[in-house]
Regions:
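Outer-membrane beta-barrel transmembrane domain signature of Gram-negative proteins
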Residues: 234-255, 397-464, 582-639, 648, ...
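Positively charged n-region of N-terminal signal peptides that target proteins for export
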Residues: 1-6
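Extended, hydrophobic alpha-helical segments in both membrane/secreted and soluble proteins
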Residues: 264, 285-291, 299, 305, ...
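Membrane-spanning beta-strand positions in outer-membrane beta-barrel proteins
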Residues: 110, 195, 207, 261, ...
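Exposed, low-structure sequence patches enriched in small/polar residues
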Residues: 373, 461-468, 472-761
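Structural preference for beta-rich elements and adjacent junctions enriched in aromatics
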Residues: 22-423, 432, 445
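Bacterial N-terminal signal peptides
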Residues: 7-16
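Sec/Tat signal peptide C-region and signal peptidase I cleavage site
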Residues: 17-21
Length: 761
């Protein structure tokens, strides 16, 4: 416990500095900026924040949303400009100019963007599908902090092909990209560059009427690998750090509606599972509804009845050569919407290893693994005063029947999650959490609870312009099946800056910690995790943009007797990124492990318990720029592995034939030779995306791995009839590579169609 006492002492000593850094001053202290830019960018003024004024449209004005910015209102709206580079030439004016105009009427916020370009045909815009990542495209990002609290924000982005992406930002830069707001954008190209025209209904945003908002803008010119921002352009800042955002003023007397959204849906399915003893097709139809109501401008209630997840994308398979379960993220929209208000321990890099709430535990029976139908669920998320509030309650059915499987009788369950955070100072909070999982129908485990406390102190003004954070948590999970050692706790100090960054995390997960609605990768351990990294940027080098060196360390000790169980180093011996965005890196990974129990690593191969293993692996990775038509990422890894050796080869290919037609191909091969035996694993994945427009897409995903011997194919068609109204067609087919039949035999297949409609009041 000496390490915990040391970190606790450091946290206490740093707390006053963090608090002082967050105290409001008579004039905000700006980040240090080069004098050349102070003369060019209003953002560098030491006495005022950059401001953009939204222009109110007159009763006779309207906007035709076509992306052209030729409506009358745009001519009388004062633009925001003078963007400053964050990369590569930090602090210098952007090489391509950008202008942003904002207008509004009674019901909508309008944003007009002109991205001037000296090479009007040089833009890149491969992606069209909603919410796709944009590593290869030009893009324009804007973030809106409607409460001006510098903690939460709405994140939006578009590219020259009209792709629309959005997310909800939470504390610790948590980004919930599964949020789909109702808004519309159009893109257009011209001989001066490309333009955007955006309409965001005020009903989509939560805000207090009559108040100013925080806002910031960022533009990416992909062929130059250039990032520029309106404000907050220092490398320690960025578009997602709302403490460095500008001000949006002038929005007054607008309508937020009655705050009620009704989303009914209808779904039809056809399922057959011949590989599981049920070869007959089962045809079914169902209806359900989601209700959303804004109780206040900042607090939203959600009720779902007869919930269905037919449109959910499949998980991406992974090869697991460890003793511990893999963590798969949530993909169901009901649980993702507003999930930032239910996060615990935000910012902890290792919090996923022992989180008290993981919504994928809901709707899955623990004993049989049977999927359970969700009868209804309710949520309350948002802000009230200085509090962030998240409440969730879900009831599953008395009988679980995974579609296409034989009905397995299981007890229905009730799940309850409550989360409260009290905002402190400018960027900090203290919080509490409670979860409950209660069985119905006389199950052996009647009631299980988890309670937790956490805090986070954060500032972007440490030593005037540096980021510094301190965080901690405590969790206790009750269970009638064990007594004592049911807790988890941790402390963290972070210094995420440039060129130096570092972090120290300490945690303990006791042997009986088992959160009923959470996830614990490993219990009975203490973890010490220091991290340090340094980034060097050669000046005026025509080829190289940056070098990076660093080390991530994990020491894992037995929580009872402090025996060393694991010691892992991840040494970045060399990382080089070129201005072209091509990278190459070399890592050294020394490891030590004490096996506490027998480890069946592969069928017929078991590593015996109580053996000590020390080995070192090496990893060489290269990545070509994503903006290229063919982007390649090969990985080679070799070296020791337990009692022998392991070789790993992986290859990722991204083929962007033209805007809207993209192929992702990946393969991974592991060859393991141990004293106890040898084996191989293989993983293949192919994804073909046909994006007809920003409103219509078809995605085919094919995967096969030798660990499960299952070949899976999902075909997913989505048509956004209008924002908020969606039509899905999804087909899923799984085959088993049966060595006795020497062929692939069908396990199950399922076809689904789903129509969702949104009506707003």
């Amino acid at each position: 416990m000496t390490s915990f006492r040391l970190t606790f002492l450091l946290t206490v000593l740093l707390a006053p500095a963090l608090a002082r850094a967050q105290q409001p001053a008579s004039t905000p202290a700006p980040a240090a900026q080069p004098p050349s830019v102070a003369q060019k960018a209003a953002a560098s003024s030491p006495t005022e924040r950059r401001t953009i004024v939204a222009m109110r449209m007159t009763s006779g004005e309207s906007i035709v949303l076509d992306g052209r910015l030729d409506d009358t209102i745009w001519g009388r709206t004062q633009p925001a400009g003078d963007f400053v580079q964050q990369d590569p030439d930090n602090g210098q004016p952007a090489t391509e100019q950008t202008e942003v105009r904002i207008a509004y009427d009674q019901n909508n916020l309008y944003i007009g963007v002109t991205c001037f370009d000296s090479d009007p045909d040089g833009w890149l815009g491969y992606q069209r599908r909603r919410d796709e990542q944009l590593p290869a495209d030009d893009r324009f990002i804007w973030t809106i902090d409607t409460y001006l609290n510098a903690r939460t924000a709405y994140y939006f982005e578009m590219n020259p092909s009209g792709l629309m992406g959005d997310a909800l930002q939470g504390v610790g830069n948590v980004n919930n990209r599964q949020w789909d707001g109702i808004w519309t954008g159009r893109a257009s190209r011209s001989d001066v560059g490309w333009t955007l025209e955006v309409e965001i209904p005020f009903r989509t945003l939560n805000f207090n009427p009559g108040s100013d908002w925080g806002i910031n803008f960022q533009r990416t010119v992909r062929r130059k690998n250039e990032e520029s921002l309106w404000t907050g352009w220092a490398r320690n800042q960025g578009v997602r750090r709302m403490t460095n955002a500008g001000l949006l003023t002038g929005i007054r007397d607008v309508s937020q509606g009655h705050g009620l959204d009704i989303k009914p849906y209808a779904v039809a399915t056809s399922v057959s599972s011949p590989g599981r003893g049920d070869s007959q097709f089962r045809n079914d139809g169902d209806v359900g509804v989601d209700l959303f109501y804004n109780l206040t401008p900042g607090l939203r209630a959600n009720l779902t009845v007869n919930t269905d997840f037919a449109e959910t994308e499949v998980d991406q398979r992974q090869v697991n050569l460890t003793r511990f379960s893999l963590f798969f993220p949530e993909k169901r929209d009901f649980f993702l919407d507003g999930s930032t208000f239910l996060d615990f321990g935000s910012g902890f890099a290792i919090s996923g290893a022992f989180t008290p709430f993981h919504s994928r535990r809901i709707g899955l029976d623990e004993a049989s693994g049977t999927q359970q139908r969700i009868n209804f669920g309710g949520k309350l998320t948002g802000q009230a005063g200085n509090q962030d509030i998240g409440v969730l309650h879900v009831q599953t059915g008395q009988e679980g029947a995974s579609p296409g499987h034989r009905t397995v009788p299981v007890a229905g369950e009730d799940f309850t999650v409550m989360r409260l955070k009290r905002r402190l100072l400018r960027q900090s909070y203290i919080g509490a959490m409670y979860t409950r999982r209660a069985s119905r129908g006389g199950a052996p485990i009647v009631d299980r609870h988890t309670v937790g406390l956490d805090f986070r102190l954060e500032t972007g003004s440490f030593l005037r312009s540096q980021n510094l954070s301190a965080a901690g948590f405590f969790l206790h999970a009750s269970s009638p099946l064990n007594a004592g050692k049911n807790s988890a706790m941790g402390l963290e100090i972070g210094f995420p800056n440039d060129p130096w960054s570092g972090e120290l995390e300490l945690s303990e997960v006791q042997s009986n910690y088992d959160p009923a609605v959470g996830f614990a990768t490993r219990t009975g351990i203490r973890r010490i995790s220091p991290t340090i990294a340094y980034t060097a940027r050669p000046r005026q080098n025509p080829l190289i943009r940056r070098f990076q060196f660093g080390n991530d360390v994990n020491w894992i000790l037995d929580s009872d007797d402090n025996r060393m169980l694991n010691r892992d180093f991840n040494i970045t011996a060399f990382l080089m990124e070129l201005h072209s965005q091509d990278t190459i890196q070399f890592r050294v990974l020394p490891s030590y492990e004490l096996l506490e129990n027998d480890f069946r690593i592969s069928p017929g191969i078991t590593l015996p318990a109580l053996r000590h293993y020390s080995f070192t692996r090496y990893r060489l990775l290269a990545t070509t720029a994503s903006r290229r038509v063919l982007a390649v990422s090969p990985i080679a890894e070799w070296g020791g592995f337990y009692s022998g050796d392991r070789r790993r080869l992986a290859l990722n290919l991204d083929v962007r034939m033209r805007p809207g037609v993209i192929f992702y191909l990946s393969t991974e091969w592991n060859k393991v030779d141990l004293a106890e035996g040898s084996f191989q694993t293989k993983l293949y994945r192919g994804i073909a995306e046909t994006q007809f427009s920003p409103w219509m897409s078809l995605v085919n995903n094919v995967q096969f791995d030798t660990q499960s011997s299952i070949l899976g194919w999902q075909s997913r068609f989505r048509w956004i009839l209008k924002p908020g109204n969606d039509l899905y067609f999804v087909y899923l087919h799984n085959w088993l590579d049966d060595p006795l039949l020497a062929r692939f035999a069908t396990l199950d297949h399922r076809a689904s169609s789903k129509l969702l409609y949104t009506h707003r009041f």
